[in-house]
């Protein structure tokens, strides 16, 4: 069983549609308190902090059947980088509209940090109890936006969707109509690269 260290409905939906058994557990990590040297460093650090926070919570649980079934934890964090500036979720309508007016007909990069903790197999065939295995990587996908009118921008912002997503857009939602194309992993833009997770799960289970 996989633990998703996130309350993100988008990430939960990705795993559910892919048929990956999992449970969600909120990490409680304060995302505003992190120092970072780059966007890549930020999402890498935050994804690992989220996974380790859930790891600590699991260690406090009694060794019941549920906790014994858990063999891996994944933490993720995403930001959108546009013209060298890091965009998280827009704080208000004015900021969301301003961003969209800047992004119209241009492109940026959605970065998602992935931190996968797992219980490696020991020589006796049992699994390590403390999630000492770690695989982590930042995946980047370029997103190109359509040439949008002011009316299209304000209409999209009025749906409320931009306030739920890094960068202020949801590829899996209404924002899809405002995107011309992507270069890279589709699910990474939604918040979790499924091809990357498949490789991590394969390594953890071997």
Regions found by a protein language model. Give the residues of each.
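N-terminal beta1-alpha1 ligand-phosphate binding loop
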Residues: 1-20
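Anionic-ligand binding patches
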Residues: 3, 38-206
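Surface-exposed, flexible loop/turn segments at secondary-structure boundaries
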Residues: 10, 30-32, 122
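Histidine (H) residue identity feature
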Residues: 12, 22-23, 114, 136
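A structural micro-motif
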Residues: 20-22, 71
């Amino acid at each position: 069983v996989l633990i998703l260290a996130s309350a993100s409905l988008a990430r939960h939906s990705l795993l559910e549609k892919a048929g990956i058994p999992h449970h969600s557990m909120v990490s409680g990590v304060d995302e505003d308190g992190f120092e970072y040297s780059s966007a890549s460093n930020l999402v890498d650090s935050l994804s690992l902090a989220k996974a380790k926070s859930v790891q600590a919570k699991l260690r406090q649980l009694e060794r019941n059947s549920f906790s014994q079934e858990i063999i891996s934890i994944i933490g993720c964090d995403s930001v959108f980088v546009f013209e060298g500036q890091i965009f998280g979720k827009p704080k208000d309508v004015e900021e969301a509209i301003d961003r969209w007016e800047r992004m119209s007909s241009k492109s940026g990069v959605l970065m998602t940090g992935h931190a996968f903790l797992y219980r490696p197999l020991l020589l006796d065939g049992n699994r390590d109890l403390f999630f000492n295995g770690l695989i982590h990587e930042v995946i980047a996908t370029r997103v190109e936006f359509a040439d949008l009118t002011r009316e299209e921008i304000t209409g999209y912002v009025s749906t409320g969707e931009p306030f739920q997503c890094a960068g202020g857009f949801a590829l899996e939602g209404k924002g899809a109509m405002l995107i011309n194309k992507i270069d890279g992993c589709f699910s990474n833009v939604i918040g979790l690269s499924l091809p990357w997770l498949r490789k991590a799960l394969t390594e953890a289970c071997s």
